Amino acid sequence: VGALPAISYDTDLGLGFGLIASVARFAPKFVPYRWRLELLLSANAKRAPGRGIEVPFHDDYLNMDFPGLAGDRLRITARVGFRKFANTGYYGFGNGSIAEEPWVGIDPETDLAAYQAARRYHRYDRIFPLLQFSARIRLWDRSTAEQRKRVEAFVGLHGDYNIIRPYPGSLLEQDIAAAKADTPEGETLADLLQGTDPHARLTVNGGAVFDTRDHEYTPTRGNFTELSVRAAPGVQLGLRYVGVTLSSAWYKALVGDWLSIAFRGVADVIAGDAPFYELARFGALTPRDGPGGGWSLRGVPRQRYAGKIKLIQNLELRSLFWRFSIGKSRFAVGAVAFLDAARIWADWRRTELGGVGIDGGSFKVGTGGGLRVRWGETFLVRFDAAYSPTERTSGFYVDVGHVF
């Protein structure tokens, strides 16, 4: 049993505050636990453009994890949640999309309203309650007490209801209007800019997982590979699409827990009429924002890049160098150095807007380092500072769990 203030920080979201609590029951022959519940009630506060404080992100959820069902062959996870993301990023599509700065030259002291509107040029408000369910079935298992060696299949459902609210004068508002024009540029935008009206969405997920990690939360040896498919039948607005993800993470101990190396490669592709916000996300088993943000390309703004084809790589050098106890609680402190890279394509064909290709440029890069604090066996907090030499932007992140 554990409960902590949910204190987090993200350059894009600001300071997070709230409560995170977890309850886990341990039992012999069940790794990592018999069951676990996690509750998060949180919001983020950030300095508003010009002056004042805004609350850009609100996140509540209850996670349920039952790994020991059907003779320890079935694992069921579920999440019920609600999110309000008032500064969701929208920069257009493709690897060559431009992050404009229309607020340059506007004095917030003399024209605060214009300055705040300009700072929201690449932002919109998204509100979505959600429900997730996933069942993982163990197909093959040769695990030992020291290390897993198993293959699992998973199936799941994800449902949400989305309300999209563009800010006046924002790029999203402009592109929604441009997508209605009977021009080549309008047709291109209309193909990519789907799902801007309120809508319900249902996706069916399925895939397989190969897991040889020595620890679920702080692995130093082994591999975790996901091959997954997510498909939406088009409940509303004709949002019918299929997404495929291949993600493989590798861990190698160099000097036990003292020094290890970790690498993840992700390829994510989408075909069909996906909602535009899905083009800035990847994965089915654990969906994440990216490329961009603290879970994919650190140092680059969240939702910075959007497209139907994504490649993401993460390399980390990890160390757990200090272990201690406070009462009956066990802690470990470590450090990480990392390098992230990503490349994206807007669509399967060459895509142009205004006669110019939007997929130019090379890989986007973020690099940095941070600290890790582990409490017990299932709770880890990370502190990461990052800089992107390709974007010339920086980020700082405090969150729960390794990036991969």
Residue spans for each PLM region:
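Short loop/turn motifs that connect adjacent beta-strands in outer-membrane beta-barrel proteins
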Residues: 1, 26-35, 68-76, 140-152, ...
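Outer-membrane beta-barrel translocator domains and adjoining extracellular loop/strand segments
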Residues: 19, 50-52, 88-96, 165-174, ...
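Residues that define the transmembrane beta-barrel architecture of outer-membrane proteins
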Residues: 13-17, 21, 33, 54-60, ...
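A subset of solvent-exposed loop/turn segments in beta-rich extracellular surface proteins, enriched
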Residues: 20-134, 139-184
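Outer-membrane beta-barrel "beta-signal"
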Residues: 371-373, 392-404
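C-terminal outer-membrane beta-barrel translocator/porin domains of Gram-negative envelope proteins
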Residues: 47-49, 61, 180-197, 201-338, ...
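Residue-level signature of outer-membrane beta-barrel architecture
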Residues: 7-9, 23-25, 66-68, 133-139, ...
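Transmembrane beta-barrel strands of outer-membrane/channel proteins
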Residues: 7-9, 19, 35-45, 76-84, ...
